[in-house]
Amino acid sequence: AVCVSLLGAANIPPHPLNLINFMEMIRYTIPCEKTWGEYADYGCYCGAGGSGRPIDALDRCCYVHDNCYGDAEKKHKCNPKTQSYSYKLTKRTIICYGAAGTCARIVCDCDRTAALCFGDSEYIERHKNIDTARFCQ
């Protein structure tokens, strides 16, 4: 089956949106049959919180994203969950706009890296909704 992303085809111009940006980036990079929500409770790190060791490559994407947000908060005094930024989805990649070192660019780069990582990583069904108390120590 061929999946055509209308977002990519339309070449939507840059726009600031906050957390919705990250969801849109994820939708752009993941397989067509998946929804961004399927990544919200996956492994030890995809979703709220996180502990233990990532259980696979996809979970490692979330682990790296969590740490990226943590660095943005601690080192740069940014608020990643509410930070607006501008980006463009084009030609199967994501372009972040803004000056390097600004909160907008830092957060966009965190989200971009994670979304592209999601697109490159295998989604293993049995790692969704796992017992984190048992598997994430």
UniProtKB/Swiss-Prot annotation:
Enzyme class at the top of the EC tree: hydrolase
Disulfide bonding pattern of the chain: 44-136, 46-62, 61-117, 68-110, 78-103, 96-108
Signal peptide feature range: 1-9
Gene Ontology BP terms: arachidonate secretion; lipid catabolic process; phospholipid metabolic process
CC cofactor: Ca(2+)
Primary localization: secreted
Active site: 65, 111
Entry note: cofactor: Binds 1 Ca(2+) ion.
Function field: Snake venom phospholipase A2 (PLA2) that shows presynaptic neurotoxicity. The A chain has phospholipase activity. PLA2 catalyzes the calcium-dependent hydrolysis of the 2-acyl groups in 3-sn-phosphoglycerides.
The name this protein goes by in its record: Basic phospholipase A2 beta-bungarotoxin A1 chain
Top-level taxonomy: Eukaryota, Metazoa, Chordata, Craniata, Vertebrata
